[in-house]
Amino acid sequence: NLLPEAILSAEPLERLRRNKTEIFDVVEQAISEELFNLPEGTKTHPELNGLQLIIREVIIKYLGKLLEYDKRMVPFMVLAHESEVYKEYSIETSEGMFQLKVGGRIDRIDEIGVGTSSDRLRVVDYKSGTVRPTDLKSIEEVFDVNNILKKHSDYCLQAILYSIIESENDKTYNPEQKPVSPALLFIQSLGKKDYSPVLRIGGEEITDVQRYKEDFENLLKQTISEIYEPKVPFTPTSEIKFCQMCPYRSLCGR
């Protein structure tokens, strides 16, 4: 972990950004543990092939951009990385009610606006691509399948879901149930002036996801119910474009 669990100011972030050795060592360690499955804290680093060397340099470059952006966001705290959040929902089908656990892993949780009236948490989902989701007019647009390609609404669905769970169901990092903002942080956009990763609905940044909770969860449960409903045929989409980037396309032969 590069960043301490403390309120961050610009000076230590800039010092860290300039410390190429420390950043290199952290990336090397992460590659050894995550790519090669070596024990945590191992001091021996495997020799990398050409592609792996390129990936290492890209990661180092991305970290530099991220630290430069974080420097503009001070004061804030990084509360957690890779934090898992889940919530159980009651789903109704023609065969009755059942409980389903929904959630996943948050890339990063920040506390921003520390010590001010706008003090809140920010649920961050890192994105390495270049296509950012278009601002949505309403929560209903998040669940419109036609917006998956047009507006990348699937990114927004995940970020909002995690934020709702974080806002009310995390005694470790949000025991006071502070407001939570969902954010999609596109690494390649970090250099843009006035860039903000926080999602927008109807032209306004989401400063408290609870404002949208009721509508979102009703539509979420409705969508899940349709998936599990025995009377509704579960068939592949007729829109082949949806399948191009789908990680599950091998399951249906697409």
Predicted regions and their residues:
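RecB-family 4Fe-4S metal-dependent nuclease core
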Residues: 1-254
